């Protein structure tokens, strides 16, 4: 029992360290991609090809002064960013990186992540109010209204996933897509979810909570030094988290569709599934399947991250009224209609699946025999 507890503690610490390092080098990746799109070189002086630039930025922030505004609530001013980071990191404990690596495999994993993400909105309003700044408070109000609008969209889209997979467990949702990813079945929800992710994380072109020409830098305008770094870490941790969630919900996590490659040996033809091939090699090299699944999963996540950066480099910013109108008058009715269509089609074909997901249930039904 003690050894199991120590194992989970070490795994949790490893996960937190991994997230923080990923955030650090995601900033370098983002600056390099933006520089490439804009025909610049980007950071290339600090270390080989600028690889130490995140470390230099971290040291710069740590060594800066951390003034507290007059009449600010000191407890909330310092506690807001810290609680925001803790909530951002706590959502990671139910995210599976492959079939064997997950800190806590709970049956309501998707509901847990959605709940923890919703709690972040309370800390944003606390951070904006505690600094006693009009700009920070207006930025917090904007952020809250924006996040609530697009959390509704994300929640409705998640209902589609639950209907098709028959589960709220991340692992079961992944394996329900082993024959066909939900990105192909729910292609409209796939694109709507990506747009809602941009709005949920206050990313361009929906970064209206920190519009420089209107609100200086949003709800964290009075925070500097380590407190600003905590906001920065929590924001990018949420971006990476949503990319992981989207990969699991729509791109099948670490699974690949049953692509078959051809083997000809002594005039005998074999058709071997890629997943089955790696499971066969597992008897000789135990970690081969773990490595293969992890690489597939990481590549999918970085495709999402690249899309985030590409959107930032190419699209203009929306007006605030346009963003809210798009959320409440277009996305919410559209996603509700898509939910009813998904439920109707599911009931029309074979009813709700009890195990394995609707797609697997559909492909194994009599219609394909």
UniProtKB/Swiss-Prot annotation:
Signal peptide: none annotated. GO terms for biological process: aerobic respiration. The keyword NAD applies. Keywords: Electron transport, Membrane, Mitochondrion, Mitochondrion inner membrane, NAD, Respiratory chain, Translocase, Transmembrane, Transmembrane helix, Transport, Ubiquinone. GO terms for cellular component: mitochondrial inner membrane. Pfam families: NADHdh (PF00146). InterPro entries: NADH_UbQ_OxRdtase_su1/FPO, NADH_UbQ_OxRdtase_su1_CS. PROSITE patterns: COMPLEX1_ND1_1, COMPLEX1_ND1_2. It is found in: Mitochondrion inner membrane. It catalyses: a ubiquinone + NADH + 5 H(+)(in) = a ubiquinol + NAD(+) + 4 H(+)(out). GO terms for molecular function: NADH dehydrogenase (ubiquinone) activity. Its main location: mitochondrion. The chain crosses the membrane at residues 6-26, 43-63, 75-95, 108-128, 144-164, 180-200, 226-246, 248-268, 291-311, 330-350. Its EC number is 7.1.1.2. It is a multi-pass membrane protein. The keyword Mitochondrion applies. Belongs to the complex I subunit 1 family. Core subunit of the mitochondrial membrane respiratory chain NADH dehydrogenase (Complex I) that is believed to belong to the minimal assembly required for catalysis. Complex I functions in the transfer of electrons from NADH to the respiratory chain. The immediate electron acceptor for the enzyme is believed to be ubiquinone. This is NADH-ubiquinone oxidoreductase chain 1. It comes from Acanthamoeba castellanii.
């Amino acid at each position: 029992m003690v050894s199991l507890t120590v194992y989970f503690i070490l795994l949790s610490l490893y996960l937190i360290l991994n997230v923080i390092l990923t955030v650090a080098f995601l900033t370098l990746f983002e600056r390099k991609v933006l520089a490439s799109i804009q025909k610049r070189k980007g950071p290339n002086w600090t270390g080989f090809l600028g690889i130490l630039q995140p470390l230099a930025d971290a040291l710069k922030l740590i060594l800066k002064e951390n003034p507290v505004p007059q009449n600010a609530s000191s407890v909330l001013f310092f506690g807001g960013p810290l609680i925001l980071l803790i909530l951002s990191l706590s959502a990671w404990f139910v995210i599976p990186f492959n079939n064997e690596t997950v800190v806590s495999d709970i049956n309501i994993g998707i509901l847990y992540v959605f709940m923890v993400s919703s709690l972040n909105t309370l800390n944003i309003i606390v951070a904006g109010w505690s600094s006693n700044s009009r700009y920070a408070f207006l930025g917090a109000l904007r952020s809250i209204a924006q996040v609530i609008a697009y959390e509704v969209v994300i929640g409705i889209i998640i209902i589609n996933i639950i209907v098709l997979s028959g589960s709220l467990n991340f692992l079961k949702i992944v394996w329900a897509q082993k024959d066909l990813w939900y990105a192909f079945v729910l292609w409209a929800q796939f694109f709507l979810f990506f747009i809602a992710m941009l709005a949920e994380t206050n990313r361009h072109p929906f970064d209206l909570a920190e519009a420089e020409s209107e609100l200086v830098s949003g709800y964290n305008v009075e925070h500097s030094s380590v407190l600003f770094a905590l906001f920065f870490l929590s924001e990018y941790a949420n971006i990476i988290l949503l990319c992981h969630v989207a990969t699991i919900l729509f791109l099948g996590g670490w699974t690949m569709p049953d692509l078959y490659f051809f083997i000809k040996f002594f005039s005998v033809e074999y058709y071997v599934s890629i997943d089955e091939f790696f499971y066969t090699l597992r008897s000789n090299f135990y970690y081969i399947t773990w490595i293969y699944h992890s690489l597939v999963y990481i590549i999918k996540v970085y495709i999402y991250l690249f899309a985030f950066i590409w959107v930032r480099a190419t699209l203009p910013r929306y007006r605030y009224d346009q963003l809210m109108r798009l959320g409440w008058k277009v996305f919410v009715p559209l996603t509700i209609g898509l939910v009813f269509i998904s439920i109707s089609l599911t009931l029309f074909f074979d009813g709700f699946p009890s195990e394995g997901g609707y797609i697997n249930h559909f492909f194994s039904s009599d219609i394909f025999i």
